Amino acid sequence: MLTSGFELLLPEGVLDYFEITNVEQTKGDTSIYLQEKNIIPEEYTDRRLESKGFYEDSKVQDFPLRGRVVYLIVRHRRWLDKDTGDIVIRHWELVAKGTRMTQEFATFLKGISRY
């Protein structure tokens, strides 16, 4: 996991599910790349799941920082159910219901649940 202070800019709770893999800065913006950790979703712990990569990145605009636009580039993980052959994902609505979260984290989950 990349740790260079950028984790302080993320909504509280994000690093429970994601790790920072890269940060890119240009003159006008900062992009923080987040990859979902290989933690089996709670609702699927009784199944035999195997990580099968990621969906296409989703891009969420976060609050500006010192005049720069901040983007969170999110890679969502997918798992294969070895018994059924189904692909499963983490259901962010369930994460939201099961956690005490800050308004920032709630906004983040709302942004990524569209993808």
Where in this protein do the model-derived segments appear?
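Intrinsic disorder/low-structure terminal segments
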Residues: 5, 17, 53, 62, ...
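Intrinsically disordered, low-complexity segments enriched in small/polar residues
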Residues: 3, 11, 26, 51-55, ...
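Generic detector of short, locally flexible boundary/turn motifs and exposed helical patches
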Residues: 1, 9, 43-48, 55, ...
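Short, positively charged, Gly/Tyr-enriched micro-motifs
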Residues: 59-115
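Residue-identity detector for threonine
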Residues: 3, 21, 26, 30, ...
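N-terminal juxtadomain amphipathic helix
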Residues: 31-80
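Short helix-coil boundary/hinge micro-motifs
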Residues: 1-41
